[in-house]
Amino acid sequence: LANHDNQIVFGTTNGMTISTGLEYGPDNEANTGGQWVQDGGTANKTTVTSGGLQRVNPGGSVSDTVISAGGGQSLQGRAVNTTLNGGEQWMHEGAIATGTVINDKGWQVVKPGTVATDTVVNTGAEGGPDAENGDTGQFVRGDAVRTTINKNGRQIVRAEGTANTTVVYAGGDQTVHGHALDTTLNGGYQYVHNGGTASDTVVNSDGWQIVKNGGVAGNTTVNQKGRLQVDAGGTATNVTLKQGGALVTSTAATVTGINRLGAFSVVEGKADNVVLENGGRLDVLTGHTATNTRVDDGGTLDVRNGG
């Protein structure tokens, strides 16, 4: 389809190429061209090129769509195995997307009332660590389930969004302003921002969970060569710090849990029973205290003047 053509699909169509439909710009309801998949309609193996639009209305379904840069899919029905090669997928209320692969500055927008499952994110982190670029990768305001974030991939979970069962590999990251549940960091990073919560995160070798001022993490497990950083004003409770795991924090944070010595805590300016190793660090600020601290190989205890 080209030159403002329009295909309305009530039955089944295969192998179409769409290069028109976005005359009014991305994700604009004023667009009327392109391929429209209606209730009961199915489109398979569609190619959407620059300027092209595939619109999937409620009750419609598509599979194996490939979207290049400048093309988009407006989804209110179901989409399976969409590949975004620089293209965009906009999920509207009621939409379900399964198996989307996001490449080469592609963008999946998971809006409230939508569910994205088994997404693979290979782009979004090109702007550097924890950059709020927000227009590549996966942008979650609904529900994202079983997402895999690879090198250069980024998932941004906004305040109203939830990410469940995410795996983050080295070079990828997850930025949390909403809720993240059951994240596994296999060398990847998780940033928990003010108002964000992360529950049951597992930090494996070279992984890093950073809990910022106003962020909250619960039930984090830090395995050997993993790292948990809790900034001033951040909170991490029920931490399990395994031997060889690193805790980086200060007495201006709140951290509780267990390590190989037993229960430890950093609460209201008082640190007790903290183990520091493998890059672990505790800054004891002026007027604060630390008792029973154990500093092993690679650990640092910094006591400020008056601490």
Label every model-predicted segment.
Residues 26-28:
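Surface-exposed intrinsically disordered loops and tails
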Residues 1, 203, 222:
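Calmodulin-binding IQ motif alpha-helix
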Residues 4-6, 11-16, 21-22, 33-35, ...:
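The right-handed parallel beta-helix/beta-solenoid scaffold, focusing on the short coil/turn
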